[in-house]
Swiss-Prot record:
It comes from the Eukaryota. Residues 1-51, 107-130 are annotated as: Disordered. InterPro entries: DUF4587, PRR29-like. This is Uncharacterized protein C21orf58. Residues 119-130 have a biased composition (Basic and acidic residues). The gene is C21orf58. Expressed in skin and fetal lung. The lineage of its organism: Eukaryota, Metazoa, Chordata, Craniata, Vertebrata.
Length: 322
């Protein structure tokens, strides 16, 4: 314990502090200073404590013009530190400014949509660059709209060209395609709104086109039986049958009248022998009209004198040659 106390007392002795007043050359007032272990006086500074500056900085850095030691030594001892800080800060500021400028340029390009037209127009119209940019943007938008309209019209025309041959030459399928063609010129001034329905129209009527192809086949089948019905009506019509029967009767009566005239024209010597043979065919011939009409029986029964009464009849009938 004695040994440990001795060095403590020995260390305390050189660190004795004696306040001493030293005049400062810059200011007429005195400064408080203390004693270091080496016995040399050091300025106390603002806090009144000494600072070992000789170990890190030479005396030339601590002194100033006039021999004064104010401001404190730690600030004067490192003259290179502020220069490094200033250079790094300047670099950071320049980098930030460059970034800001780049962002502004990007925003301007985005507003202009990356088009070189506005850049070319700016030097020509240096007095009003904003107007030139706006006009250029409007022109570009108009051109884009026109191009889109042309593309849409081309697509629609192609779709119609493909849909036409696929559907065939059916008249029922063509009318649904005609209305969209009439709508196209009316909708050309405002293409953006009605364009999507235009593209949908050719796709929607395709399934009904198959149904339309089946529908006309049914009427064709329905039209086939009517021509078959007409001949059935003709075959079973009563009027036509009556007309045919009347014509046949007229022809037969005409033949009978002619035969009677021929017999009368013959001389009397020849009339006696031939009277017997022709009477047999007369009785046989009327059998044919007997099936059609009952009037022919009377002709067969009539005597030869009755034939003379029938002579004026041909003038009334005046039928043509059979």
């Amino acid at each position: 314990m004695a040994r440990s106390r001795l060095p403590a007392t020995s260390l305390r002795k050189p660190w004795k502090l004696d306040r001493q007043k030293l005049p400062s050359p810059d200011s007429g007032h005195s400064l408080l200073c203390g004693w270091s272990p080496g016995g040399k006086a050091r300025p106390a500074g603002n806090t009144g404590a000494w600072a070992p500056a000789e170990q890190f900085f030479p005396a030339s850095n601590r002194t100033r013009e006039g021999g004064g030691l104010w401001p404190p030594l730690p600030l004067q001892s490192s003259p290179a530190a502020p220069t490094m800080l200033d250079s790094s800060a300047a670099e950071q500021v320049t980098r930030l400014t460059l970034k800001l400028l780049g962002q502004k340029l990007e925003q301007e390009r985005q507003n202009v949509e990356g088009g070189p037209e506005g850049l070319h127009l700016e030097p020509g119209n240096e007095d009003r660059p904003d107007d030139a940019l706006q006009t250029a943007l409007k022109r570009r938008r108009d051109l884009l709209q026109r191009l889109r309209e042309q593309h849409l019209l081309d697509e629609l025309s192609r779709a119609q060209a493909w849909s036409g041959p696929s559907r065939g030459a059916l008249g029922s399928a063509l009318p649904p395609e005609l209305p969209p063609t009439g709508i196209l010129p009316t909708a050309s001034p405002s293409p953006l709104a009605p364009d999507p329905p235009r593209i949908i129209l050719p796709t929607v009527p395709q399934p009904p086109a198959t149904i339309i192809q089946q529908l006309p086949q049914q009427p064709l089948i329905a039209q086939i039986p009517p021509p078959q019905a007409f001949p059935t009506q003709r075959s079973g019509s009563i009027k036509e049958d009556m007309v045919e029967l009347l014509l046949l009767q007229n022809a037969q009566v005409h033949q009978l009248v002619l035969q009677n005239w021929m017999l009368k024209a013959l001389p009397p010597a020849l009339q006696d022998p031939p009277h017997v043979p022709p009477r047999v065919p007369r009785a046989a011939r009327p059998r044919l009209p007997a099936v059609h009409h009952h009037h022919h029986h009377h002709h067969a029964v009539w005597p030869p004198g009755a034939a003379t009464v029938l002579q004026p009849a041909p003038s009334l009938w005046t039928p043509g040659p059979p």
